[in-house]
Amino acid sequence: MQHSERRVVFFDLDGTLHQQDMFGSFLRYLLRHLPLNLLLVVPMGPVILAGLAVSGRAARWPMSLLLWATTFGRREAVLKRLEAEFVGWFRHHVTAFPVVHARLTAYLTSTYADVWLITGSPQSLVEQVYRDTLWLPRVNLIASRTARRWGGWVLTLRCLGHEKVVQLEKKIGAPLRLYSGYSDSEQDNPLLGFCQHRWRVTPQGELQQLE
């Protein structure tokens, strides 16, 4: 079967395959363990909120600024240790959505689907949290990316909203033609718009088909 005949399917991660917001949980975890960084985060709060209000909730730079303020002045070894500790904590507390995982498994065991996991959470966190799952090596992952800049961590890519469309087009070309999409968030509507079948994941992990 040629690739053009295959069914392309995408899944969001946070609120879709599991209940929690991984990146938001990570930022809160860092601030609990690096409380002095609140001295930088709090004064920048109005700038960050204004940036999200003006540029949109999917904008990269306000959340990049928040991540930088949260990690500024900390050695890389300290941040990596906290990241590893967070991964262990998150793996213990995460709530999976079995109904959505069943759909994911069905597509992965089929012979006709190419599955893309497209998430706003940082790639390093996704790969560590789900490192021992059977499904992660079998999906095509597109995620936000982080790097060290100016004494802290920043987001070099925030894979949210229309950026998901841009990144998937870079991988498989435009115009997009997707068979099915699964997400809990209206921020994914730009990508869901290219799907023949669109599914909204409820806060309880159930599926509702969109028109």
Each language-model region and where it sits:
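Alpha-helix initiation and N-capping motif
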Residues: 20-23, 60, 64, 75-76
